[in-house]
């Protein structure tokens, strides 16, 4: 999927709509996280609930949130390395629909396992149309889980290409997930950066619109680990300072004799902003 950005490096509305459409298509397709379970064996397949066309209607605020999340996911993957990042899906063993109960269980897992096992993570709570809750996480591992991984073969449930590191993760979650009330789990490498944005943000947009009922008001659907927050905050602070300096420099030249020069500077700043966004994956506002 080609993601288009404006001159300031932000994702365009058209790109966000495309991401939402991709999220809808994948939510209704045979995604690995919905039909395959490489951590907890399950004999039955639970088809995903179809989403209504309302999921295509993106509010301005949601577009901004999705754009920010998309950039953060991109920067996360670029920072920790594609080979060391994976998608972790956690599904409760029972039918949990209360977001407070879901978060209570997740907090226990977060404190005892996630904070110690992974370098950083981004977590999205996904309420399905039925009300059942599960979690999608982007986790940064200490080992390469991607090298040699044959994605088409794995989608056919042939796991022979999986390396030792990812097999170790699968084994770990088979033993650990039930202790925290989780059943079916899955950890998969990220196939590509654009796919990562499409799958992760597409799910957030489509399911967020469809399933944000009264009981989910005030519930944080997206959460960043402490290390992920520090990483993104440091990058944002640096670029904000850089942007401020450029802006001050720009406005200091506004006089009756330098209108043409200011216009040239504005053009240069737009190009500069887009370049910084392309290199770092962080939006200059």
UniProtKB/Swiss-Prot annotation:
Keywords: DNA replication, DNA-binding. One of its GO terms (molecular function) is DNA binding. It comes from the Bacteria. InterPro entries: ORF2/G2P_dom. GO terms for biological process: DNA replication. The keyword Nuclease does not apply. The keyword Oxidoreductase does not apply. Essential for autonomous replication of the phasyl DNA replicon. This is Phasyl DNA replicon protein arp. It comes from Escherichia coli.
């Amino acid at each position: 999927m080609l993601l288009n950005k404006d001159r300031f490096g932000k994702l365009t509305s058209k790109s966000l709509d495309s991401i939402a459409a991709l999220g809808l298509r994948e939510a209704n397709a045979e995604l690995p996280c919905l039909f395959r379970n490489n951590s907890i064996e399950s004999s039955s397949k639970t088809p995903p609930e179809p989403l209504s066309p309302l999921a295509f209607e993106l509010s301005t605020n949601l577009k901004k949130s999705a754009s920010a999340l998309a950039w953060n996911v991109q920067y996360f993957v670029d920072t920790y390395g594609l080979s060391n990042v994976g998608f972790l899906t956690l599904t409760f063993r029972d039918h949990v629909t209360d977001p407070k109960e879901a978060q209570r269980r997740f907090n226990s897992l977060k404190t005892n396992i996630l904070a110690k096992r992974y370098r950083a993570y981004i977590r999205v709570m996904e309420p399905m149309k039925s009300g059942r809750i599960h979690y999608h996480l982007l986790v940064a591992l200490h080992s390469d889980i991607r090298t040699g991984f044959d994605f088409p073969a794995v989608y056919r449930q042939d796991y022979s290409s999986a390396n030792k590191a990812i097999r170790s993760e699968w084994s770990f979650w088979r033993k650990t997930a039930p202790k925290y009330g989780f059943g079916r789990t899955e950890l998969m490498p990220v196939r590509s950066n654009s796919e990562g944005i499409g799958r992760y943000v597409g799910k957030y947009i489509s399911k967020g619109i469809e399933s944000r009922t009264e009981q989910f008001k005030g519930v944080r659907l997206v959460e960043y680990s402490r290390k992920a927050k520090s990483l993104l905050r440091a990058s944002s602070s640096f670029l904000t300072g850089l942007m401020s300096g450029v802006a001050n420099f720009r406005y200091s030249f506004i006089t009756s004799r330098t209108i043409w020069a200011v216009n040239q500077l504005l053009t240069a700043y737009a190009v500069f902003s887009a370049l910084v966004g392309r290199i770092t994956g962080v939006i200059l506002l």
